[in-house]
C-alpha cells in the first residue's frame, strides 16, 4: 500500500564489470500535502461508454493497441471515482516542460520545479488534454504516483512504484458542494424575492388603508355638513309651516261654520269614502248622524304627532260630547295612539252587542278604542291627509261606495250560478279597458297618498318657546348668503300679494253687497223678531239648535281652550318675530332683515284677514237664514229621499229607528225654543268669545 509520507524509492541500475561504481543521486524533496478537489456536477461528467471510447481513441493516437490503456506521459493529473480514471495533461506550449515528454513516457526526468511555483496565467495558459481510462477497483492500489492540484496551480506529489513510471493521481471526494451552493443561492434569491413581495404588499396595504381612511374622512365631513343643512331645512320648514297654518286658520274656521249647518255632512262624507266606509257598520252609521264636527290638531310640537276630535250631539249611545284620539311619536319614531274612554249607555256597549251582530268587530268605534290594531295608523293617516283635507269631495258623490259595494254583491249573488261567455275577438278590448281601470285606480291611490294636510293642521294646541324660535332664526340666517334668501322671500311675497289681491277683492265685493242692501238684512231680522211663533221659523230655529247651537253649547269649553291656545301661539309668534329683529340687528346680515320684513308683512296680512273676517259676518248671517228657510221648504223632499235611501240600504227597520230619532229631536227642540231664538245674536259677534285668526 502506498504511503504518502515516504518518498519514492530510487531506481537501481545494473553495473557492468567495466563500469566503476558511482555515488547515488540525492533523494527528491518531500511532496506537498494533499489537496481535496470537488468533483464536477453530474451533468458535466462523461458517461462510462463515452469514457471508454475516448480512452481507446487516445490510445490509438499514441500507437498503442487495444490492450490496456497506458497513462499519458507526465505531467498529468488523474481524477478517479467509481472505477473511472481521467488524465489531465498539459501540452507542449506550457513553459517548463519538454516536447519530448509526450512521446517518451517519462524518459526525461521530471522537472525539479513544481507547477505550484508558476504564476496563475502561465499555469493556465497551455493547452489541456484529457484522457479517460476505465480501471478496476484493484488497480487503484497498484498506482504509483499521486499528484494534487489546487485552484492556483499544480502541486505534484509522487509515489513512485518500482514497476511503473511516475504518475500523478488526484483522489476527489464525492461531495456536491456546488449543488449545495447553488441550492443555497436559489434559496437566498427566493427569500429575497418573498421579502420584497411581502414588503411591497405591506406598503400597498398601508397605502390603501391611508387612502381609504382619507376617503372615509371626506365622506364623514360631507355627511356632517349635509346633516347640518338638513337640520336647518327642517327648522325652516317648520317655521314656514307655522306661517301657512296661521294663514289658513280663518278659512278653516269658516269651513267648520258652514259644515255645522249642513245636516248629515260628515256621515255622508265618511260613508262615501272607499276605505273608511269599510269600518262603519249599521250601528256606527246611526251614531255618526249625531256627529257635528271633525277637527285634526297638532300637538305642542308639529313633529310630535297630532290628535283627532269628534264632536257629537246628545245621543242615546254614549254620554261623551267630544271623543279624542291622539297619535304621538315615541323615541323610535313609531306612532303610539291614545284615546279618551267612551262612556256608553247601559246596553249599548260593543261587547254586549257582539254576540248578536257579526259586524261589531268591523266597527269604527272598536278601532277608535283599540290601540293594538295594525291598521290603526293607516286609517288615521287617511282621515288626516285625505278626508279632513277635502271632505266636500266625498260629500258630493252621488252614491256612497257602500251602496255601490252592496250593488256589486247583489249582482255577484245573482250571477253566481250562471256561466259567462267571453268572445275571443273582443277579449283584447276587455283587457284594455281593465288595464285602464287599474291605471285609474292606481292614480287615485297616489293622489290619496299625497299629504296635503302638512299645511292644513289647525294650531289650537300649537305652542312654541322663545328660545326655540330664536334658535331657528339664528340657524337659518347664519352662514347663508343673501342670494339664497332672495328666492324664497320673493316667492312668499308673490304668494302674499296674490292672496291679498284675490281676497281683498272678494271681501270688498261682499262688503259692498252688504252696504248696498242693508235694508234687506234689517227686514230679515225684523221678520224673525216679529214672528217668533211662526212654525216655519221655529223649525228653522230648531234646526239651528239641533244642528249647531246645541253642539256649540257642548263645545264651549273646547272653544275657550282653543282661543286661549290661539292667544298663546300669537303671543309666542310675536315674541319670535321680535327675536328675529333682534338677531338681525346684532348680526347685520341682509338675510335677517329680509326675514323680519316678511314677518311684518305676514302680521299685516293677518290683521287684514281678521278685519275682512269681521266684515263678512253679516254675509254669514244671511247665508244661515237662507239655509234655514230652504231647509224648512225642503223638509218634505229630504224626508222622502231619506226614506228611499233607508229602504234601499238598510230596510224598514232602519227607517223606523231614524223616524223615532227625529221625533225625539223635535220634542227636545220644542222644549228649548227660547234658547234657539238667541242663535243669530250669538253668531253676530263671534269675535267676543275669543281672539280669531
Swiss-Prot record:
Record-linked SUPFAM superfamilies: NAP-like
InterPro entries, A to Z: NAP-like_sf, NAP_family
UniProt superkingdom: Eukaryota
Stretches the record annotates as Disordered: 1-56, 104-125, 175-207, 474-605, 627-693
Keyword match Coiled coil: no
Gene Ontology BP annotations: negative regulation of cell cycle; negative regulation of cell growth; negative regulation of DNA replication; nucleosome assembly; regulation of protein kinase activity; regulation of signal transduction
Glycyl lysine isopeptide (Lys-Gly) (interchain with G-Cter in SUMO2) crosslink, residue number(s): 11, 163, 165
Skewed-composition ranges (Pro residues): 23-44
GO CC list: chromatin; cytoplasm; nucleolus; nucleoplasm; nucleus
Biased composition (Low complexity): 531-542
Biased composition, class Polar residues, residue ranges: 487-496
Subunit relationships: Interacts with histones. Interacts with CASK. Part of a complex containing CASK, TBR1 and TSPYL2.
Biological function: Part of the CASK/TBR1/TSPYL2 transcriptional complex which modulates gene expression in response to neuronal synaptic activity, probably by facilitating nucleosome assembly. May inhibit cell proliferation by inducing p53-dependent CDKN1A expression.
Similarity annotation: Belongs to the nucleosome assembly protein (NAP) family.
Note: Synaptic activity down-regulates TSPYL2 protein levels by inducing rapid proteasomal degradation.
PANTHER family reported for this sequence: TESTIS-SPECIFIC Y-ENCODED PROTEIN (PTHR11875)
Protein name: Testis-specific Y-encoded-like protein 2
Species whose genome carries this gene: Homo sapiens
Lineage of the species this protein comes from: Eukaryota, Metazoa, Chordata, Craniata, Vertebrata
Amino acid at each position: 500500500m502506498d504511503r504518502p509520507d515516504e518518498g519514492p524509492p530510487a531506481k537501481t541500475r545494473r553495473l557492468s564489470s567495466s563500469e566503476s561504481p558511482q555515488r547515488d543521486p540525492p533523494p527528491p524533496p518531500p511532496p506537498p500535502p494533499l489537496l481535496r478537489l470537488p468533483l464536477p456536477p453530474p451533468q458535466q461528467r462523461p458517461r462510462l461508454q463515452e469514457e471508454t471510447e475516448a480512452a481507446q481513441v487516445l490510445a490509438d493516437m499514441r500507437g498503442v493497441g487495444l490492450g490496456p490503456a497506458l497513462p499519458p506521459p507526465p505531467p498529468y493529473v488523474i481524477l478517479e471515482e467509481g472505477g473511472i480514471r481521467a488524465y489531465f495533461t498539459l501540452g507542449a506550449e506550457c513553459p517548463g516542460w519538454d516536447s519530448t515528454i509526450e512521446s517518451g513516457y517519462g524518459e526525461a526526468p521530471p522537472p525539479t520545479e513544481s507547477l505550484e511555483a508558476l504564476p496563475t496565467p502561465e499555469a493556465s495558459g497551455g493547452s489541456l488534454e484529457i484522457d479517460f481510462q476505465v480501471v478496476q477497483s484493484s488497480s487503484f492500489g497498484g498506482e504509483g504516483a499521486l499528484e494534487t492540484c489546487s485552484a492556483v496551480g499544480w502541486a505534484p506529489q509522487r509515489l513512485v512504484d518500482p514497476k511503473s513510471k511516475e504518475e500523478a493521481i488526484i483522489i476527489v471526494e464525492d461531495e456536491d458542494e456546488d449543488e449545495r451552493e447553488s441550492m443555497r443561492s436559489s434559496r437566498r434569491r427566493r427569500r429575497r424575492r418573498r421579502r420584497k413581495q411581502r414588503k411591497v404588499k405591506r406598503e400597498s396595504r398601508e397605502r390603501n388603508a391611508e387612502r381609504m381612511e382619507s376617503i372615509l374622512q371626506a365622506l364623514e365631513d360631507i355627511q356632517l355638513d349635509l346633516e347640518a343643512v338638513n337640520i336647518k331645512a327642517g327648522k325652516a320648514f317648520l317655521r314656514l309651516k307655522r306661517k301657512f297654518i296661521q294663514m289658513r286658520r280663518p278659512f278653516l274656521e269658516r269651513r267648520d261654520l258652514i259644515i255645522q249647518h249642513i245636516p248629515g255632512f260628515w256621515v255622508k262624507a265618511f260613508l262615501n269614502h272607499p276605505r273608511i266606509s269599510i269600518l262603519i257598520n249599521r250601528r256606527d252609521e246611526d251614531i255618526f248622524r249625531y256627529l257635528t264636527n271633525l277637527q285634526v290638531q297638532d300637538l305642542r310640537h308639529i313633529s310630535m304627532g297630532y290628535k283627532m276630535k269628534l264632536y257629537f250631539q246628545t245621543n242615546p249611545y254614549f254620554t261623551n260630547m267630544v271623543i279624542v284620539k291622539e297619535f304621538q311619536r315615541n323615541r323610535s319614531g313609531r306612532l303610539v295612539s291614545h284615546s279618551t274612554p267612551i262612556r256608553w249607555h247601559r246596553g249599548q256597549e260593543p261587547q254586549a252587542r257582539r254576540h248578536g251582530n257579526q259586524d261589531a268587530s268591523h266597527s269604527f268605534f272598536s278601532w277608535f278604542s283599540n290601540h293594538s290594531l295594525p291598521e290603526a295608523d293607516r286609517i288615521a293617516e287617511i282621515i288626516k291627509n285625505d278626508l279632513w283635507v277635502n271632505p266636500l269631495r266625498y260629500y258630493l258623490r252621488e252614491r256612497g261606495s257602500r251602496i255601490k259595494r252592496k250593488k256589486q254583491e247583489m249582482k255577484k249573488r245573482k250571477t253566481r250560478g250562471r256561466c259567462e261567455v267571453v268572445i275571443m275577438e273582443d277579449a283584447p278590448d276587455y283587457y284594455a279597458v281593465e288595464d285602464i281601470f287599474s291605471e285609474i285606480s292606481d292614480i287615485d291611490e297616489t293622489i290619496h297618498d299625497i299629504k296635503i294636510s302638512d299645511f292644513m293642521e289647525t294650531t289650537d294646541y300649537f305652542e312654541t318657546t322663545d328660545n326655540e324660535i330664536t334658535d331657528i332664526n339664528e340657524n337659518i340666517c347664519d352662514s347663508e348668503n343673501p342670494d339664497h334668501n332672495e328666492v324664497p322671500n320673493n316667492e312668499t311675497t308673490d304668494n302674499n300679494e296674490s292672496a291679498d289681491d284675490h281676497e281683498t277683492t272678494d271681501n270688498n265685493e261682499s262688503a259692498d253687497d252688504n252696504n248696498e242692501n242693508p235694508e234687506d238684512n234689517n227686514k230679515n231680522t225684523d221678520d224673525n223678531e216679529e214672528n217668533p211663533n211662526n212654525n216655519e221659523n221655529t223649525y228653522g230655529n230648531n234646526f239651528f239648535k239641533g244642528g249647531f247651537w246645541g253642539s256649540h253649547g257642548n263645545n264651549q269649553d273646547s272653544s275657550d281652550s282653543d282661543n286661549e291656545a290661539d292667544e298663546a301661539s300669537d303671543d309666542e309668534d310675536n315674541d319670535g318675530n321680535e327675536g328675529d329683529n333682534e338677531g338681525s340687528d346684532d348680526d347685520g346680515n341682509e338675510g335677517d332683515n329680509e326675514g323680519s320684513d316678511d314677518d311684518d308683512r305676514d302680521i299685516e296680512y293677518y290683521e287684514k284677514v281678521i278685519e275682512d273676517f269681521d266684515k263678512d259676518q253679516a254675509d254669514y248671517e244671511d247665508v244661515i237664514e237662507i239655509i234655514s228657510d230652504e231647509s224648512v221648504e225642503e223638509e218634505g223632499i229630504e224626508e222622502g229621499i231619506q226614506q228611499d235611501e233607508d229602504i234601499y240600504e238598510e230596510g224598514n227597520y232602519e227607517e223606523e229607528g231614524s223616524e223615532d230619532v227625529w221625533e225625539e229631536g223635535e220634542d227636545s227642540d220644542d222644549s228649548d225654543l227660547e234658547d234657539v231664538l238667541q242663535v243669530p245674536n250669538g253668531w253676530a259677534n263671534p269675535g267676543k268669545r275669543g281672539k280669531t285668526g
